[in-house]
Amino acid sequence: MRGIVYLSAGLIVGLMFATAPAAVASSMYASLSTPSTDDARPLVSPIPRETVPYDGPYAPGTIIINTSERRLYLILPSHQALRYGVGVGRPGFTWAGVTRIANKREWPDWTPPAQMLRRRPDLPRHMSGGIDNPLGARAMYLAGTLYRIHGSNEPDTIGQAVSSGCIRMTNQDVTDLYERARVGAKVVVLR
């Protein structure tokens, strides 16, 4: 009988330790877009998200990025759009065109492209997804390009031209957009 009690206790303790890493891993990102309270990074965009009137040619679900305004618009039904602040490509890294969302990822890994590594050999060759990853909480991959609409581990750069061509958003805003935008959605990038 004593052997069964020890065996049962051992199994319970073993299960506690076996599930602890999974619990820690899931709790690390449980708050999809909110850094810990000890983190000094701002939690909100310096440019608040808002619903604005829209009377243009694009259908609901279309994403319009106006890089000169540093704003992204998600077209809604009823002649409205959600407007978000974004960070855009710095001089020499701006672009314009029409594409679509090819893929979406939560807490994406980041592998800098070869061109970026040539410019910045100090960068890691690969970084797993997480709060310190430059892609932030979500990424929407733009078809036919190396660019993404993604979160950021530097939310204070929203409203600035600092990226290598990607469109940066706060983790809160990119999580909101990620839930609303579908794979295949049209993306129009204007200068």
Regions inferred by a protein language model and the residue ranges of each:
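Positively charged n-region of N-terminal signal peptides that target proteins for export
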Residues: 1-4
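Short helix-onset patch at the extreme N-terminus, typifying the N->h transition
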Residues: 6-9, 31
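Bacterial N-terminal signal peptides
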Residues: 8-18
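Generic structural signal for beta-strand residues in well-ordered domains
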Residues: 16-18, 56, 65, 133, ...
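Sec/Tat signal peptide C-region and signal peptidase I cleavage site
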Residues: 19-25
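Cell wall/extracellular polymer interaction/catalysis modules
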Residues: 26-115, 129-131, 138-140
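Exported/periplasmic cell-wall-interacting domains
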Residues: 78, 83, 92-98, 105-191
